[in-house]
Amino acid sequence: MGDRHTIQQNLNGLLSKLNDPDPDMRYMSLNDLYGILSNPCSSYLAHDQASATRLAEGLLKALDDQHGDVQNQALKCLGPLVARLPLEGLRTLLERLSNLTTSQTIDTSVPNTALRVIVTALPRPQPNQAPSPDANMAYSAVSEVLIPRLIGPGPHKRRGSVTKGMLEKDPAKGFSSDAIDVLIQVASCFGALLQESELTALEKAVMSIIDNDTAGTVVTKRALAAISALVVYFSDEQFGILVSELVERFNSPQLSTVHRRHLIAAVGCLARTVPAKFGPHLSTLAPFIFSAVGEDNLEVSHVLHYLCTSASNVYSSRNKPKIYHQYRQLPKEKLITGM
């Protein structure tokens, strides 16, 4: 109890110094706070909701500091803090940070970065092992709070709602590549626990970005990376549905040149990331890629390479699908060498 009492006194003192007008003092206080949170003696905070809440409030305030060094040190403290937070405290922190990502008055890259730090620091499922109770608890908070905020309210809930999904287009700022990076981190850390409905909803939110001709190059590339992170956890049935949706998009009479380029890039991501899942769908998607050959588009050449690499990996030399042999017969100046 003596150690706990001393630590609590130190924490209270450090939290009060976060209001000091001297940024150096605020930085040093956060540095000391990081040391305490990293010490096993502070593990009692997991059972002290009031103290954990005060710490979270102090760090949230420090994230809005005008000095970058102070902000960065506050971000550093979030990692060890989430290991000490009770479930309700974790939910509250995720909710607060998620709401800040759609603010019109602050630099929203900071709360997005904070969310990535938290997701990375949470206990996660390990390969070939049953998820631990801590990993299940962490996933429940991510599932209940963060994923709905990424996606936004469904159509039946949107009427009268002022809450915008983090992945939705902001009228003033456009799409957020930072929010996409949060999704990628969620998929990387908790993909094995994501429900099919969550995977589908996240995929649809990302595809709405890929479908948008006004999405910039950086945002589109991050959206493609997000699709790659998600499809690893798709069932064969889910993957088949995604392929069918891509075919519908390719066949749309309103398909623009930019949109088709984005879709071709998405096909390349699928072929590169999950070649075994992609193999059975080669003959379905290949014609859309071949139709773009000769348009002086390097992306098409890359995608053809991935398609045929997938064919080479999935099929035996005698049973390679028609696309593989079509690829080999195309003029070399249209292609990437190495096949």
Curated annotation (Swiss-Prot):
Effect of deleting the gene: Cells show a dark red color when grown on an air-medium interface that induces development. Cells are able to initiate the cycle but are blocked in the initial stage of early nest formation. Cells exhibit reduction in asexual development and block in sexual development.
UniProt-listed InterPro entries: ARM-like (IPR011989), ARM-type_fold (IPR016024), CAND1/CAND2 (IPR039852)
SUPFAM superfamilies with a match to the protein in the record: ARM repeat
Subcellular localization: Nucleus
Keyword list, A-Z: Nucleus, Repeat, Ubl conjugation pathway
Miscellaneous comment text of the record: In E.nidulans, CAND1 is separated into 2 distinct proteins: candA-N and candA-C (AC Q5BAH2), corresponding to the N- and C-termini respectively of the protein in other species.
Role, per record: Assembly factor of SCF (SKP1-CUL1-F-box protein) E3 ubiquitin ligase complexes that promotes the exchange of the substrate-recognition F-box subunit in SCF complexes, thereby playing a key role in the cellular repertoire of SCF complexes. Acts as a F-box protein exchange factor when interacting with candA-C.
Identification of the protein by name: Cullin-associated NEDD8-dissociated protein 1, N-terminal part
